[in-house]
Amino acid sequence: MLDNKFGFKQRVASLRWLSAAIMLSVSAVPAWAFSIDDVAQQAEKLAQKGFEAPKSNLPAQFRDMKFADYQQIRFNNDKSYWNNVQTPFKLQFYHQGMYFDTPVKINEVTATTVDEIKYAPEFFDFGPVNHDPESVKNLGFAGFKVLYPINKADKNDEIVSMLGASYFRVVGKGQIYGLSARGLAIDTALPSGEEFPRFREFWIERPKPNDKHLVIYALLDSPRAAGAYRFTVYPGRDSVVDVQAKVFLRDKVGKLGIAPLTSMYLFGPNQPSPTLNYRPALNDSNGLSIHAGNGEWIWRPLNNPKHLSVSTYAVENPKGFGLLQRGRDFTSYEDLDDRYDLRPSGWIEPKGEWGKGKVELVEIPTADETNDNIVAFWTPDVLPETGKPLDVKYRLHFTRDEDQLHSPNIAYVQQTRRSAGDVKQSNLIRQPDGTIAYIVDFIGPNLKELDENAPVASQVSIGDNGEIVENNVRYNPVTHGWRLTLRVRVKDAKQPTEMRAALVNGETTLTETWSNQLPANE
């Protein structure tokens, strides 16, 4: 009996301990948590039914306004969302106007709830914009922005903007907005025309008091695709966004652009302005950088062509690619108003193996800097089946530290300059000879370590539309690197001319690959 009583008491004690442990476990893990799977369920359901085009609810007065008028509509700072919440992040919202004519739904996610953030005209100062107050009562938000004390502890600056289609922009400390990222690109540069998916709904997690990151979910929709996105934003000297996406195709597409970047290139040293301009360069980005799966680094200077141009680089399991702004000296741009020297580079760092595919660069003619005419993305060789999810993860860096965006073991292209080719005559006067000259400066720690008399040579190739008439490599005592000079004779000016070059020392490759295109009709 004593043994039985003791055994019974022991079992009771064990059950009490187990019950307490279960209670502690339940209380330690939230009973409910919002995740990308919740958004993915909606995306999958959307993809299983026909696309419903969003309907504009915007009065003509707002739809027809000019950009300068739209800028007059400002969010009231004292209405910033989370003003009364202990968090360094604040939210503000964009009003509908111009081509931002369709409202997007924006929700706040807490530990226990999901609540829509309702539009109210009182959020906005309409300034000199004359309007009927009744006409804006039932409108909505066009998008939102995130504020954070990134530059000064006592001042909130804008660090994220999500406005229009699936576009978003992010900046780090000391940066200003430049290039944009997108959620997805469909049929870019195809004759059938491009399809622009849009984020139709957002869910933003309310940060905890000590959180230094912000989580944003988005539901993407378009005639042939739907998708779920999770963005985790880490503001800092270089702001970083971890992106997770689950994309479902409604119908077949010709081309699917993953991790698209959009930028602007008007002119620069490799393609000087056709009209006299005090600015040496005017661009948000000046080159495409690729770190291929086989380890090769490629640098492709950007162009503003006279005709649509598409360049393709076969890359299996890319290690990274991006649109960069190399050259951070103010004297490279000389623009006090638009400060192109402060605009960030965008670098995509894939997570996991993406498989076989291509990095594609699209260059579109533009007459001025108001048009984003550069697009870069990765496109898979095998598209997902309709209704089957395409899962992709990557990290997006917004940085001005381009020195970190290339291998420390090889040199990189500091600058590319283009001019008319010439030959020095016996009287020392340079005479143009109908060729195109390229000056390419390579710099890097490995070149600095070489003696200036080292046997550095070039490996150069050119397409069928051109021939190399000069190929010269010399030490540059100013940069402690090496300068490559090429003179190219073009056979048919109506066709583009492709060329590639790298520097070597014997069997050792010293530099990244310079991959250049001379556009047609230059």
From Swiss-Prot:
Signal peptide limits: 1-33
GO CC field: outer membrane-bounded periplasmic space
Keyword terms of this UniProt record: Periplasm, Signal
Protein localization: Periplasm
InterPro entries referenced in this protein's UniProt entry, alphabetically: Gal_mutarotase_sf_dom, GH-type_carb-bd, Glucan_biosyn_MdoG/MdoD, Glucan_biosyn_MdoG_C, Ig-like_fold, Ig_E-set, MdoG_OpgG
One function term, GO molecular function aspect: carbohydrate binding
Pathway of action: Glycan metabolism; osmoregulated periplasmic glucan (OPG) biosynthesis
Example of a GO biological process term: beta-glucan biosynthetic process
One matching Pfam family: MdoG
Family: Belongs to the OpgD/OpgG family.
UniProt function note: Involved in the biosynthesis of osmoregulated periplasmic glucans (OPGs).
Stored PANTHER family: GLUCANS BIOSYNTHESIS PROTEIN, GLUCANS BIOSYNTHESIS PROTEIN G
Protein name: Glucans biosynthesis protein G
Record organism: Pectobacterium atrosepticum (strain SCRI 1043 / ATCC BAA-672)
